[in-house]
């Protein structure tokens, strides 16, 4: 039972690791002894986080556009120039689009689906050889897909493609979880509720909306970095080695209270 929750010495990739939930997870990984690669399209934000995280451990930044296979292939080649295996892949990079149903544009559907659903699938496919090399029966490699409570319950905003992509990602997690287990790779998902991030900044800036959201959360607050980091650490440690194809909701009880 000793060191059951340790992730020290592992190597991880966190996509979208320069902000929001991705940055929260990446920072926790670095602080807990994980060699962590973070990716983002935005070089300045990426370098800022790399500099901050590197004060506590090893963090490498790679600028990447993962909306298509060209960017995924480029990232894979660069990672392979450093690593022969990977222990953890966090599919966190994502985007959203809000518009009324009557005016919702095709580009708002395609862009969100490409980044939120297609990218995790093809990233996992591409990195399969490196994940297989690392996986052991008693401590499998891990793929963690960052979903959302919006993929489970009715969203507050008209984010049709976002909620659909996250719902599909939850089912993809179940599918891949069952299929990848034979390779000693555990695939799970985290469905966060409301955390401080760029995507939820409109809530934080609106006092009335913020109060309305918190009123719906039994634990009367927004999520903290420790809340999401603790879940990610658990899912990447030996403590979760028999957890596969599952989605853990981290929302302060919001879905439970909704009935």
What spans do the regions from the language model cover?
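Active-site helix of classical SDR
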Residues: 124, 165, 173
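Short C-terminal tail/terminal secondary-structure segment
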Residues: 2-4, 233, 244-259
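Short, small/polar-rich loop/turn modules that mediate ligand/substrate recognition or access, typified
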Residues: 181, 186, 243-245
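Conserved glycine-rich cofactor-binding loop
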Residues: 11, 18-19
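Residue(s) in the substrate-gating loop at a strand-loop-helix junction
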Residues: 148
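Substrate-binding pocket helix/loop in short-chain dehydrogenase/reductase
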Residues: 100-101, 105-113, 213
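Alpha-helical segment proximal to the catalytic Tyr-Lys
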Residues: 129, 178-179, 241
């Amino acid at each position: 039972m000793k060191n059951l929750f340790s992730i020290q010495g592992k190597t991880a990739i966190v996509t979208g690791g320069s902000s929001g939930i991705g940055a929260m997870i990446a920072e926790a990984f670095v602080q807990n002894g994980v060699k962590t690669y973070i990716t983002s399209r935005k070089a300045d934000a990426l370098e800022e986080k790399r500099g901050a995280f590197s004060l506590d451990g090893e963090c490498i930044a790679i600028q990447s556009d993962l909306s298509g296979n060209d960017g995924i292939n480029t990232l894979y080649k660069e990672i392979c120039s450093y690593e022969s295996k990977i222990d953890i892949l966090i599919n966190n990079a994502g985007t959203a689009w809000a518009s009324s149903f009557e005016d919702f544009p095709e580009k708002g559907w395609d862009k969100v689906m490409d980044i939120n659903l297609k990218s995790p699938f093809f990233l996992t496919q591409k990195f399969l050889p490196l994940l297989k090399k690392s996986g052991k029966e008693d401590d499998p490699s891990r793929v963690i897909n960052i979903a959302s409570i919006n993929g489970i319950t009715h969203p507050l905003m008209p984010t049709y493609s976002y909620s659909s992509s996250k719902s599909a990602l939850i089912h993809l997690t179940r599918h891949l979880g069952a299929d990848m287990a034979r390779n000693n790779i555990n695939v799970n998902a985290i469905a966060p509720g409301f955390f401080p991030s760029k995507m939820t900044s409109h809530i934080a800036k609106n006092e009335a909306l913020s109060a309305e959201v918190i009123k719906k959360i039994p634990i009367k607050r927004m999520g903290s970095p420790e809340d999401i980091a603790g879940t990610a650490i658990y899912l990447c440690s030996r403590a979760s080695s028999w957890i596969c194809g599952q989605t853990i909701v981290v929302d302060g009880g919001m879905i439970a209270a909704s009935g």
